[in-house]
């Protein structure tokens, strides 16, 4: 996706299309090498959500959409390689903190920290989007993304009943990609946002709504349905 956003400045469109097709071919080849040790259910109907969407985890999944939507909007409005690396650096720091502390055991605090850090990064980006401030913003957004997405994934893995975790993880991946691609499409199209500043303001709004929705509904839903 990042290559697609920044590729036209490096390669002509036809070569980008050939590159995309080649990567799709590599993906298809690698998929054929995957061996699944479980037998698929027999006598399934023509249309089925089995192994595709788990409705029990849909509410946390919809709440989780705020994370990839914000990330997609920001990446579409800020085509800077060092900014992307700063986001990756923030996420790596989250992984280290997760191993060294017990903060991951408190989901409510984890999501709160994640959204607040993301908000801080967006505000910095809104005020100054160049120089050291840009890298600090990317680091905060990456760190906040790690905190938020870490707990949302944990919820979607713990909520399923027996033998449903694969479907739940598939739901997580589907919603993550849907949110990211939708955010890119909306931000790049120009139908909703005409300037980068408007994109950042929209991302701030999405972040606030995601935090409030978690505190008011998702956290309570998880406590009521966990291990039922």
Task: List the model feature ranges, each with a label.
Residues 1, 85-89, 170-178:
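Transmembrane alpha-helical cores of Major Facilitator Superfamily
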Residues 2-15, 182-197:
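Transmembrane alpha-helix termini and helix-breaking/packing motifs in multi-pass membrane transporters
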Residues 14-34, 198-220:
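Symmetry-related core transmembrane helices of the 12-TM Major Facilitator Superfamily/SLC fold
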Residues 27-61, 225-228:
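Flexible interhelical linker loops that connect adjacent transmembrane helices
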Residues 53-92:
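Extracytoplasmic gate region of multi-pass secondary transporters
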Residues 83-107, 111-119:
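Transmembrane alpha-helices of Major Facilitator/SLC transporters
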Residues 106-152:
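C-terminal transmembrane helical hairpin of 12-TM major facilitator-type secondary transporters
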Residues 160-195:
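A late C-terminal transmembrane helix in Major Facilitator Superfamily
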